[in-house]
């Protein structure tokens, strides 16, 4: 998924294994470019496909409670905040083999200018206000 912010383009991609249930290593990483066509780099200044690099900056990763955090989309709401929707497996949930949706606000690192979610983990079991959708367009 690609978004534009402050004249930069941010590519969000999933890395790791997905269809391994609670053993999934999926995570969302991000790279930045001056062009929508790339090349995209992490804050380590290495290209996302550089095997000696970090493959981008971590946005959201698996945790002790949620595995397989990936397949994302970004939503910008009327107050100009960005939100990320993605799926994951609740490891200790009633149906740990079923992927469930998550939504978290994207925060922006003041130093690297890269996006991430709070604690870089899914906000499971946390009460929070989500985005307000004013109008749906088809």
Language-model-detected regions and their locations in the chain:
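Carbohydrate-active catalytic/glycan-binding domains of CAZyme proteins
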Residues: 1-138
């Amino acid at each position: 998924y690609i978004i534009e912010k402050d004249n930069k383009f941010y590519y969000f991609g999933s890395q790791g294994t997905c269809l391994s249930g609670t053993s999934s290593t999926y995570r969302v990483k991000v790279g930045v470019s001056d062009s929508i066509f790339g090349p995209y780099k992490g804050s380590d200044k290495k290209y996302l496909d550089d095997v000696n690099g970090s493959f981008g900056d971590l946005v959201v990763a698996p945790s002790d409670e949620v595995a397989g955090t990936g397949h994302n989309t970004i939503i910008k709401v009327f107050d100009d905040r960005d939100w990320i929707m993605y799926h994951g497996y609740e490891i200790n949930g009633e149906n740990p083999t079923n992927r469930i949706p998550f939504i978290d606000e994207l925060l922006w690192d003041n130093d690297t200018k890269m996006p991430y979610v709070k604690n870089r983990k899914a906000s499971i079991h946390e009460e929070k206000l989500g985005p307000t959708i004013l109008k749906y367009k088809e």
